[in-house]
A protein has these predicted regions:
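Short aromatic/hydrophobic "clamp" motif used to bind/position activated sugar donors
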Residues: 73
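Glycine-rich, basic loop-to-helix element that forms the pyrophosphate-binding segment
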Residues: 52-68
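Conserved donor NDP-sugar-binding/catalytic core segment of glycosyltransferases
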Residues: 81, 85-127
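A conserved acidic beta->alpha catalytic loop
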Residues: 23-37
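Terminal low-complexity segments of carbohydrate-biosynthetic enzymes
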Residues: 148-152, 210-269
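A recurrent flexible, glycine/aromatic-enriched loop bordering the glycosyltransferase active site
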Residues: 134-156, 215
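A short, conserved alpha-helix in the catalytic core of glycosyltransferases
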Residues: 89-91, 153-155, 161-164, 170-196
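Short, acidic, metal-binding catalytic loop of nucleotide-sugar glycosyltransferases
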Residues: 7-19
C-alpha cells in the first residue's frame, strides 16, 4: 500500500506549503487498498479521497487538473518518495514562474540512490515509446533545462495552465510522450529541475489493473490521434509501421478501430 508511505513521508520529511491538500484519486475503491485509504484519510484532515469508477486507467491522475483546489499540482504515483529539499525547490521554481505553462519534473532516482534518469528519449523500444536516458552534465549544473519527455510518476503544473487531457484512455501505457506533447501544444515545455529527485517503486507483484498489450496499443493510438488528428501524420505512420512488426495485422487493426471509435473518428479498414 505505497500511498501510505508516500503521504506520510511528505508530512514527516518535507516543509509543505500552507493549505496543502492531499487529493487521492482511487481507481479501485472497493478493494482492500481502497478501504485502507479511506481509513487513513480519517486521521489526516487535509486528505480528500475521490473515487474514480467511470474508467480504470493510469490516466485518472490527470483528473486532478479539475478536482484539485490548490494553485500548484504535484502529481505522484502512489509508490513514489521524494528526495530532501524537493518541495522547497519546486515551490521556489513556481514562485519565479507563476504563469508558466511548463510541466516540471526531475531525475528519477534508482534504488541504489546513485543512478538517475533525468529524461526519456522519444524512440520506440519493446512495447513503449520512450527510453530512459541520463544527461549527467545537465544534472550536475543544477539549472532547470528542457527535456523531450519524462516518466509520469512525478510531475507538476500550475493548475490553471495544465493542458486538457482526453478521457478516452483505458488501462496502462502511452502517457509520457502524450503529456509532453500536450504541454508543448499548450505553449509550455517539459522542464527537468535537477533538485527534484524522486524514487519510484517498480517491482511490485500486485496491480490495480492488468497490463494488457491491446490496451497499451489502443492508448497509443488514442494519444497520437488526439495529438495529431490523422493516421497519416508522420508520427502515426511511424507508429503503425512499428506495431505492424510487433503484433498480427488483425490485432493491430482492431486496436486502431477501437481507438478511433473512442475518439469518434471514422475508421476505414
Amino acid at each position: 500500500m505505497g500511498f501510505f508511505f508516500s503521504v506520510q513521508s511528505l508530512r514527516l520529511h518535507h516543509k509543505l506549503p500552507p493549505n496543502t491538500e492531499f487529493l487521492i484519486l482511487d481507481n479501485n475503491p472497493e478493494s482492500d487498498h481502497g478501504r485502507q485509504i479511506k481509513h487513513l484519510a480519517k486521521s489526516i484532515p487535509e486528505m480528500r479521497v475521490v473515487d474514480v469508477v467511470d474508467r480504470t486507467s493510469s490516466f485518472i491522475k490527470y483528473d486532478a487538473f479539475h478536482l484539485a483546489k490548490g494553485d500548484v499540482i504535484l502529481g505522484l504515483d502512489c509508490h513514489v518518495l521524494l528526495a530532501p529539499g524537493f518541495i522547497d525547490n519546486l515551490m521556489e521554481y513556481w514562485s519565479w514562474n507563476p504563469n508558466s505553462k511548463n510541466m516540471v519534473s526531475g531525475p528519477l532516482l534508482y534504488d541504489n540512490m546513485v543512478s538517475t534518469s533525468d529524461l526519456m528519449r522519444p524512440v520506440w523500444n519493446g512495447h513503449d515509446f520512450g527510453v530512459w536516458g541520463d544527461d549527467k552534465g545537465a544534472v550536475a549544473k543544477g539549472d532547470p533545462y528542457e527535456v523531450p519527455m519524462q516518466g509520469m510518476g512525478c510531475f507538476s503544473f500550475i493548475r490553471k495552465n495544465a493542458p486538457k487531457i482526453s478521457d478516452k484512455f483505458s488501462g496502462f501505457g502511452g502517457e509520457e510522450w502524450y503529456m509532453a506533447e500536450k504541454t508543448r501544444q499548450n505553449g509550455g515545455v517539459v522542464v527537468c529541475l535537477p533538485q527534484l529527485k524522486w524514487n519510484h517503486r517498480f517491482d511490485w507483484p500486485k496491480r490495480t489493473f492488468p497490463l494488457v498489450l491491446h490496451d497499451k496499443i489502443v492508448n497509443y493510438y488514442v494519444a497520437f490521434l488526439d495529438l495529431y488528428g490523422d493516421l497519416m501524420h508522420p508520427a502515426c505512420v511511424e507508429m503503425t509501421q512499428y506495431w505492424n512488426a510487433q503484433v498480427p495485422t488483425d490485432d493491430l487493426g482492431n486496436a486502431i478501430r477501437e481507438a478511433m471509435t473512442r475518439l469518434g473518428l471514422p475508421f476505414v479498414g
